[in-house]
Amino acid sequence: MSVPAAKKLWRGIAFSFAIIFAYATVLVKLSHDWWNDENYSHGLLIPFIIGYIIWSQRDKLARVPAQPSVLIGGAAVVCGLFALWAGVAGAELYTQRLSLMLLLAGTVIYFWGFSLLRLLLVPFGLLFLALPIPAIVFNKIAFPLQLFASRCAVWSMGMLGIPVLRQGNIIELKPLNSFDTKKLEVVEACSGIRSLMTLLTLAVVFAYFTHSPSGNGPKSGKRFGFLRDYWFWRATIIVVSAVPIAILTNAFRVSGTGVLAHYYGTQIADGFFHSFSGWAIYIMAFILLFGIGILLDRFKPVQAEGARSVERKSPEPESAVSMNPVVSAEGSEL
């Protein structure tokens, strides 16, 4: 191993140990949340997915010329460390976790530059989606989703002629062969946050692994060339569509539970059906995402379809022209 390579290796090892030491508590608590909070249980797979992406792209990443930006990268690292200190002082876990992303991004910019950071946007995005959001933000999102799901359930049951009444996120109905009114509460776990976060992550992974190698970055060296890239917009549409798909499929699940509760009793909302319907909704949502990907590919521009083959075509070398004899004005060969 050459001396420069050995220095880079030891520098990477030292930096890794420094991050582990500084963020040991943050990483332990993050792992605990992934293991115990079902809304973010997909986070357990994120390190392996990120590792696979980086490993599969290792040759391409190694070919990126190092263009370090010491000033911007150093400023980002300092801001990350300050955010870590502020998060610890204020006992705010989300700030501490975001500081880790800022520190990692700053390190990449400091040593390699923005070119490498652009290639790592997907791993950074996956890590961001795995961070549990603050409780105050979670509640602001979850409760409106609970109300939306309960409204959809009441509307669906009304369309089927089922007598039902809604009070907030509580659905009152009278099951068949029962003289008592039963209540179904659309609790926080049924808000759809879990399926929303999981499906967003799945959409990013699906869009990344089904894109063409020809659509990896800006075209013709232009800064905003990616805005004219079909594969960029395909990935954007797939990821954005994950939000309404997750919300609507969860509302469909709650509606189905309400209908079955009318015919078979409210106990249907617990036990096997509750778990089975959750997995069924995930499968349905992914099928819809997959269908959107297929639909977009049907409208794929010709230039996007043939971009890879065109890029592999080598232009006719200019030297071939110079091999022909040049005739002067007098007709003699030069």
Report each predicted region and the residues it spans.
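Hydrophobic N-terminal alpha-helices or hydrophobic patches in metabolic proteins across all domains
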Residues: 1-334
